[in-house]
Amino acid sequence: MISAVITAEDGGFFSHKGFSQRAIKDAFAENLEAGRIVRGASTISMQVAKNLFLTRERTFSRKFEETFITMALEQNLSKERIMEIYLNIIEWGDGIYGIGPAASFYFNKPPRNLKPVESAFLASIIARPGKNWKPDPLTKISEGWWKYLQLILCKIYERGDADIADLREAGVPEERIRELVEDKGQYESVPSPPE
């Protein structure tokens, strides 16, 4: 689950100090191209700060507070503890908070028993928890969302946290699997999920 969340939400989580220059640059470029805000640059640490201590208002003063709280979290907590808090406070759907209730609601199992494709699905909905997902969602998602899950799974494979059987189960094309096996490639951030 952790690998899926890092892949979908914050690829540099274990290497940055709470802020990602690359995410800021990528978000700026994507937002500029779209002419509106379509992507944020919040790291997992920033999201913990925001969800635990701040309101949802979007002001410069609140962003300033978020910056200082994020720095304090990074200085006082391990990355593992920050991730644990994150997984247990974020919303995974209408009224569903925490990875345990999310895994139970969507897949009727505890988080430790999730398959990589199920973890990828849960990671994929973090950005849009209010989309009104139902139990057993993998049978009801669009082709575009499947492609997004496949992309996440390919990145998880590149990180060494999924195997070829997981890719095949998710329907990753054999040609893509061959490419991944030949060259695991460099990690790149995953784009925003489909609308």
Please provide the spans of the model-predicted regions.
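Peptidoglycan glycan-strand catalytic modules in the bacterial/periplasmic cell-wall system
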Residues: 1-163
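Low-complexity, Gly/Ser/Thr/Pro-rich intrinsically disordered linker/tail segments
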Residues: 151-195
